[in-house]
């Protein structure tokens, strides 16, 4: 449920009005009825009566319909990474501030710092285009399980199975989109037991309309992220544009505001304890069916390792950002992306332990084993499921640390490493000569301009040295790449293992360490030059070691885990035929529902279902950027007149939780 009144002009009311946004808290799904993330086309069969019992005054057809306008037509997949909602007949779209953070950062500069000061387009001409950002509407969902499964058999390896699924999925997608401007994807559900085709209409002209300053949109920062109570004005506005005939089109001044099939009405009455709430959106991923073996690996290895690496990355970025205003803008989105799941993994580990998830998973698995053992047919069909999963995790235990470091510290660590890896592939694929080669080089230059716009050599050099050092001291030496022997045998440096010295020399010699050097390289590019480049040689040494030593084991893990999970999930559904199951999130549309309610996280701990502006003032800390409060907001607070946005007690509510 969302409350919004968009400011029409820059006046005294602007700050007051954008503070009136209130959005449902997402962190406490345990409070949601049946804790489900339900596929919208199945709501009528599975959930309609229960939703109405909780207070829904609509039908399932009102929520999801292929032939008529419904709520699904107001829900948008923003760029494939966030959810947004249509809130007007003129293409206006609401999303989270953190979802628009990349766009806000992209348009910010030292002279126009929209991250710090916020941004409001006072006319359509002032709205800011965002190249590459899309807005996709779900057109329809169709169950194609029977068609896909008909092409599969039990004699197939998992690799053969995946190849056949890709083949038949392409055929299904081609048939579904032929003669239309739609795009589609076949997605697997329940561990590869069910398959649905999702058809979308995707718009490519999405313009930024408004966003509050980060002191409101990110109030509380990492400290309050994934926590309650919170007091964050986490919202931003875009507008979708289309061709005059209403079809998707690339950015053009000739485009017009899109008129959606449906948009969500806005109400300003607020919510009360017990009110029905519903979240409609595109959640990325969940692991509801993770076994005890997966929980143990997360707690023992991957979660803490990820947190440790991101701790270091965040610390290095923060030093650079605090030292220079331009660097602060350059790294704002990178810092936010890194910190979001840094905090998530901290909270997840805490939750897994406090809720004794491992023990609960073991109990489910014991029940499953007993059920399978009761019947020879079940033993034949499902008997190997948990054994395969256990075997996979035993193998993965030996390589999980290496794989986590490869992803977090190498490919997502110092940017110069992955950039060199990516550019080598781009240069290798260049046409030999002629117009096509020039066009391809221009495309590389365009991408490079975007990359170096938000790149700071000093920060990245620190990351390069630190990530290599963490890798060296934490990954088993038996899994070390040859590059670490080179670092050990350096002739110079201020200590025996001087990663700073290695980084300094690598950056001094690399063509990727500055825009100037890279564009000089592009005057006569060659893969031979890249293959001698120290940044590229570093990442390839680590990557090749992984491929040679780890990838075979990883392939075995993948095969066993994929098959084991598929059988285990199928068996669970057969074991409990009367239970309603929902599939893990996979960036497809889902609905979850419940009621507004107070939060009781522990003994003698109680929080109201809403927060107010009083909490903002209580949290204010002028010495902590996360809790800075804008002067204008403090002035409004002192006056205390919130007009139509005041609750029954005359206060201004900020967030609520369900």
Show which residues each predicted segment covers.
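Short, Lys/Arg-enriched N-terminal segments with co-localized hydrophobic residues
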Residues: 1-13
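Terminal presequence/propeptide segments associated with secretion/organelle targeting
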Residues: 2, 15-18, 22, 29-658
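Generic low-complexity, intrinsically disordered sequence content enriched
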Residues: 8-10, 23, 27
